[in-house]
Amino acid sequence: MSSSTSSSSPVKSTGLHVGAIKPGVAKKDPILVADGVRRQFGGLVAVEVEHVEIPRNAITALIGPNGAGKTTFFNLLTGFDQPNDGKWSFNGKSLAGVSAFKVARLGLIRTFQLTKALGLLTVMDNMKLGSTEQRGEKLSASLFPFLWKKKDAEIEDKALEILRRFKLDEKKDDFAASLSGGQRKLLEMARALMTNPELVMLDEPMAGVNPALTESLLEHILNLKQEGMTVLFVEHDMHMVRHIADWVIVMAEGKVVAEGAPDEVMKNPAVIDAYLGSHQDIDLGTVTGRVTLPTLPKEK
Amino acid sequence: MDFLGILSSSVSFILAPTTLAYALATLGLAVHFGFGGLLNMGMAGFMALGAYGYAIGVLTFGLPWYLAAFVGIGAAIVFALILGIPTLRLRGDYLAIVTIAAAEIVRLLLLSSAFGGVTGSADGLSGFNGPGGTITNPAEGAGGFDQSNPIPAGTYGFPPFLDNERIWYLRIVGAIILGLAIFIVWRLVNSPWGRVIKGIREDEDAVRSLGKNVFAYKMQALIIGGVLGALGGLMLAFSTNVNSSVYVTSLTFFLWTALLLGGAATVFGPLAGSIIFWVLQAFLGLLFPALAEVGLMPFSTIQASQIKFIIVGFALVLLVVFRPQGLFGNKKELTFVK
Amino acid sequence: MRTRSTMRRRIARLASALSAFALAFGALAIAAPAQADVVNAEMPFKVSGNVQNQGKPVAGVTVTLTGAAGYTATVATDADGKFVAGVPAKEADYTVTLDETTLPEGIAVIDNPATTFVEANVQTVTVGPGGRATMNFFIGQGERHTTSFVDQVVQRLISGLNFGLMLALASVGLSLIYGTTGISNFAHAELVTFGAVATFGLVALMGPGLLWLAIPIALILSAGLGWGLDAALWAPLRRRGMGLVQLMIVSIGLSLGIRYTYQFFIGGSTEQLPGSDAERFKLFGSVTLSITDIVSMGLSVILIVAFALWLSRTKIGKATRAISDNPSLAASSGIDVDGVVRIVWIIGSVLAGFSGILWAYFRPGIRWDMGGQILLLIFAATTLGGLGTAYGALVGSLIVGVLVEGSSLFIPSDLKYVGALVILIGILLFRPQGILGRKERVG
């Protein structure tokens, strides 16, 4: 059943860290650095990350049992939620207090666990929305088509090229609502590419995706790295993590409990503990990646 | 029973100033809700500010009518800003309750005797379209909206559009404003700006994650729709007196009915919806009492004249349940976000 | 033949003249099919007058009007010494009280020899069939008559509690419905009106002596209405999985339809229930209370306690709370969600209906849009307490009730609802979970 075995093994980036491997280890060339980021809901501490660095031009997986605070951490990093405490920076620029849309403009683009394809817009309009260069989006310019028509044609060409890669070009005039769940995931990723991002953060890109599509999704993620982008993704599918990730960060109960290359980190007792602590019914084999995990109830 | 007379009176509402006023305000709602997804239930407040701003501009500040009109529009913009800055981050149904409450506050302030000297309190304001001048100095009037009418006195047209020069002037001014408004809205929603606004309607977080300043776009939509609402109120004020009892919550609900009739995410739907709404209102409002009078309906004529409102209410229910895209909307492009 | 064609021409001319009339002058009338239908009671009639000090107008003097069973309005004189107040009914008596503390130092109302009243600053006017009445006050050197501030505060507080308890009956129902179905039910106002209108109809049918029987029957009819609306409309829409926004607009349409149906049957005037003119007796100082006030508050408390017991003790009550907390979890743990929601509609309608009967005594009077007048206050109370939490709605209602009644001590009484609406907006902005609600987790 596992779909990724058929593709040839991707080239892993190695030597990303500096010094001994431990949670919060420094990276040679970090793109994103978080320090003391804490988010509390009432009495519950959802995220408390002391220090973490995301390596540039590599694929990093963020894993952990349900309720570990992965999605909340994503929200905090991208400005969709504000932490009670802490600082974090992207390319050396502090993102504390920067609103979500400005974070996106800096080149840090995210997708959502529950896909947010804009259902009643066409696939092409979804793509065009990703572009950051259209001055016709300004109210003052929008009334004068001669100011934006040419740019719109350029954007459309670029969108078509990306859509072709994602095999969505035939659907370009359909409403996004008519796509399948997997196609919507693809569309969301394609749309993110329209913004020319530096760091792409994918929240469970494989969740709910038809097995027939997983392979192409994996390839697209690997392509991002080849094109010089950095990828950080949350995933429950350990098989996928082992297959494509260069680096793995493990979260449990809001904290980073382990880091390392995929094969090593899976053997780390802290990781096995974290998973066993919350899912004692799960066979250790699934955790270490020999079997695909059963579909777990999704984090809110 | 004079069926032809009833029909002709009803048809005359196609070009009535009130219909044009409704169409303008409904177009504003289309920008808010149909394209921007903003659940504005306080359109009556925007209309009231447009109408009262104009009337007060003439009567209290002694402005010429065309400058006073901008007082009304300016008041609506300020209202949109005050309302929007804190509320635009609220969930849809919360926004609905906040806007309805804000519009009621506007109405209660206009009704209160505390500001009666400026607003006329329960009596409302009148005489601002005439040669007028201010309340305190009626002599200095330089000529108001009525005096700007270039059409010579007389009766023009053919039945059922046989009317005097004032009505024709109102129609022409209204049609020009509405035509311009429809053109601008059409341009806007078919531009990249419109694409962003429609994206926000579908999922504002997704649009935010693509680097768009969602708040600014929503605010722009709120202001544009609010100005259209104020223009609707202005149109009502051009044609008659202003009174706070007009700008009640029901008015907003009637606008919503007209909007959903025509199709919320369409540019011409608001006009079509307003025409249908008013022609039907007039038709039923004349037909039922006439039927009651000749004994074909077992009610008093007063009761019969109220049936049309009952029909409006239940028609709104049926529309939302069975034809949410409106009479002219695209079935696929249902405007309701889940 | 000839006469007929002239007739037709004449009719045509008449019709076109009529339509022109409708266009030119009727726009206002047609654009205002509902007069002031929300929050502020319609006050079509007027009491006005002058306050003069030896022929010169006195501005800023507070004048309070009171009328049958609870009507009060406070207005101030303008620069010309004039005051105007709207009153709810014609052919009725109103007491006009001039607050002498608002007069300049050293002067008071001169005893008017034309009246037999001892206190010259308290006068009675009769609004005749014309709907207008005048009451002039003449000021000069003299002694003042004062109502102590404490008395006023106590009076407002009692009135506010009464109003708040009445609101609570309506808002706990709205809150339960919101909690279990997610509907912001605008038609709740019509459920409120229904109780009063049904009682009125039954009294007309059975005679005023059977009021004690009419009220329970009206409540049974309310229950039937709630059941019917859910069975015929809301349950099918729920099964279709209709979105919350659509449901809200459906409730708006329903509200308009039902409201005008009431108007169709009872007309546009204000009618009274038997006992609304009950005498007021003096509690202490100038604080007065009527027997209907006491009965009204007593019954509210009994009903609210019964409701709280139902919600906390019975199986269905517990199921209701479970659904409010987490509908899908409740459904998967074997609770019959549809059945419970049906019961919630029935109970919500009965409470709203009873609240309508009390509102008819408090306003006083029955009108086709009486529920709509307090709908936003009910929303405010529900929101203040935390949307979907029944106990919160109770607390919120009491706060809104006291606030609305108390605020007229400080601001003009025709603005007393504004305070509550401002609070509604403020709560939605800064603490949408209400004072008793829990904060939702984001993300």
Where are these regions (language model features)?
Chain B
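Transmembrane alpha-helices and adjacent helix-loop boundaries
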Residues: M1-K338
